[in-house]
């Protein structure tokens, strides 16, 4: 006990006689200037300013078709070609790990920012806040460059010389019937389970994905791009909860697919996402390209899936336009095709949730932000392209 008191006393007395008067220079508040803030994190400020400058230029010039076409040819398509080749060699989805890393980093930085604000460590809090802001601005700026530009450059329809014109119900019925026949025919040559549902090996479908655009590129040279492999997403079930069958990630130029969804539409969904790699941004055009690619691929699984995708869009349109005609065409479908349609509907019915509804609204807003005024209805616009193209082909 005496030792404890001795130590306490020595510490207390060691400070005695050294009490200092307040230094007026240290207590005087320092004036905050732009230079002092810049010195706290110069790299973050530089990244933020460059990102904001590009974003300002993008939103001012995005209606200038010549500028957007130049950026598309000089920067966007070359980047997608380079990144597509680079990351295609990786057997897993790099995109998925990038998203997980950025999500974790964002959570850590937000927690760190809150802690530093609570502790009034203003300089460190400012650095953390600027890190969050600069990284977010840079990611958005790159997104507008590597994806947004495509919405304002020449569309696939324009590059391919296709036209959209008014179609009659009779025209719609004719092409719907054509794809019903194609689906029924191709459906006889694919692997099925005892329940009659399409059961092809999904890993094998992904393995064959680099080759599916060969035929379509001969018809539409503007679709030429490196032959890259689509990637299954490890957390595919999470995509189902927000009703995503897949997505294209412009930073890595990877086509990422929901491998948990029904196999019957997986090949055509792969073709859809790979259309984005080829500079096809709009969803209706990507669906059209997916159908053409699958039908011209020479691969029975892809051909069946493409015909099924086309029938679904055309059939839904015909259902709204002429129910009796739709019912008559539907009656011509083989039982195998009907089994796949039922299995697909049953699967997605399990994910009719508020989260899925919010996801659809968010994505519709996203499409409209980038000039796709039809929003989610743009998927239905592929009906016009399919009807005109295949009607003329006959």
Region annotations inferred by a language model:
Residues 335-394:
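Pan-zinc metallopeptidase signature
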Residues 114, 124-253:
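Contiguous, non-catalytic segments that form substrate-binding/exosite surfaces or channel walls
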Residues 52-115:
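Membrane-embedded alpha-helical segments of integral membrane proteins
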Residues 3, 11, 18-23:
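Short, positively charged and aromatic/hydrophobic N-terminal segments
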Residues 91, 266-280, 284-287, 291-292:
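Active-site recognition of the HExxH zinc-binding catalytic motif
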Residues 170-174, 281-325:
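Post-HExxH zinc-binding segment in Zn-dependent metallohydrolases
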Residues 46-62, 138-143:
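Hydrophobic alpha-helical membrane-insertion segments
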Residues 34-47:
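N-terminal membrane topogenic signal
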């Amino acid at each position: 006990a005496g030792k404890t008191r001795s130590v306490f006393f020595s510490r207390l007395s060691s400070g005695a006689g050294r009490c200092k008067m307040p230094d007026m220079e240290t207590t005087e508040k320092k004036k905050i200037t732009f230079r002092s803030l810049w010195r706290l994190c110069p790299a973050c400020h530089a990244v933020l300013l460059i990102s904001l400058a590009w974003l300002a230029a993008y939103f001012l010039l995005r209606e200038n078709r010549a500028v957007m076409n130049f950026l598309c040819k000089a920067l966007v398509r070359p980047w997608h070609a380079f990144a597509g080749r680079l990351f295609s060699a990786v057997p897993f989805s790099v995109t998925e790990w990038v998203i997980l890393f950025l999500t974790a980093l964002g959570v850590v930085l937000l927690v760190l920012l809150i802690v530093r604000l609570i502790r009034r460590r203003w300089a460190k809090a400012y650095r953390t806040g600027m890190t969050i802001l600069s990284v977010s601005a840079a990611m958005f700026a790159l997104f507008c460059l590597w994806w947004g530009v495509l919405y304002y450059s020449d569309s696939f329809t324009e590059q391919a010389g296709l036209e959209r014109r008014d179609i009659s119900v009779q025209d719609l019925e004719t092409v719907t019937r054509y794809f019903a026949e194609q689906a029924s025919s191709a459906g006889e040559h694919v692997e099925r389970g005892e329940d009659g549902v399409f059961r092809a090996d999904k890993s094998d479908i992904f393995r064959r994905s680099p080759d599916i655009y060969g035929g379509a590129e001969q018809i539409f040279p503007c679709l030429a791009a490196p032959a890259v492999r689509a990637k299954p997403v490890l957390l595919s079930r999470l995509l189902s909860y927000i009703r995503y069958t897949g997505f294209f990630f412009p930073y890595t130029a990877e086509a990422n697919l929901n491998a948990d969804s029904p196999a019957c539409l997986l090949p055509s969904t792969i073709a859809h996402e790979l259309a984005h790699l080829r500079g096809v941004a709009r969803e209706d055009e990507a669906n059209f390209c997916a159908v053409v690619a699958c039908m011209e691929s020479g691969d029975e699984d892809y051909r069946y899936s493409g015909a099924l995708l086309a029938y679904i869009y055309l059939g839904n349109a015909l259902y709204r336009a002429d129910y009796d005609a739709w019912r008559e065409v539907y009656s011509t479908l083989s039982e195998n095709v009907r089994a796949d349609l039922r299995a697909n509907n049953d699967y997605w019915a399990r994910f009719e949730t508020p989260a899925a509804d919010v996801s659809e609204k968010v994505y519709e807003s996203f499409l409209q932000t980038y000039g796709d005024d039809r929003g989610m209805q743009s998927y239905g616009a592929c009906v016009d392209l399919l009807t005109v193209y295949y009607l003329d082909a006959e």
